[in-house]
Amino acid sequence: EEGGVTLRRLLREARRGKFKPKDILRDSVLIYKRYLEQNKLMFAFIVGERSGGSPVIRKAIRLEEEHFVHEMAQDLRDLGTVPGLSSQTLELICSLVVTTMLNAANDILDLPTDQKQSEQELVDHFVAQLRLIFLGARLWREP
């Protein structure tokens, strides 16, 4: 929980204007990557337990994911990033983002520290995945 609070605060700052709007995705990915690298043991535990751990731990991890989703949805609503979408749809979009972030954690944690090219390719790929989510969100029409 403690690590989640810090990471959510860092990412919230990125979304709320500390960075240029066009750089928010890349800056958020870099913040996330740096945070994972600084907290490898915790995230290795989270990634492993998220799908194979005890039910109590999985529930705690899901609760943190829900906090991320709700906060991000509120920020997107406040920023008008994807106008005209319901709260339910915003939370669906944010759920895709959080799932993508957590799925990328293993790849980030497995990166050798001396392979800058691989690191750049991974960051670029992760940014492209998030960009695709938001491009789709902008085109989404409520049923």
Model-derived features: where do they sit?
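Short helix-capping/turn signature of helix-turn-helix
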Residues: 48-53
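Amphipathic alpha-helical packing segments from all-alpha helical-bundle domains
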Residues: 2-9, 35, 55-81, 91-106, ...
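Short, structured loop/turn "capping" segments at alpha-beta junctions
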Residues: 39, 43-44, 72
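C-terminal effector-binding regulatory domain of bacterial HTH transcription factors
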Residues: 137-143
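Transmembrane helix-loop junctions in multipass membrane proteins, especially transporters and channels
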Residues: 82, 111-115
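Hydrophobic alpha-helical connector segments
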Residues: 9-38, 87, 93-97, 123
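Short, hydrophobic secondary-structure boundary micro-motifs
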Residues: 44-47, 85, 117, 142
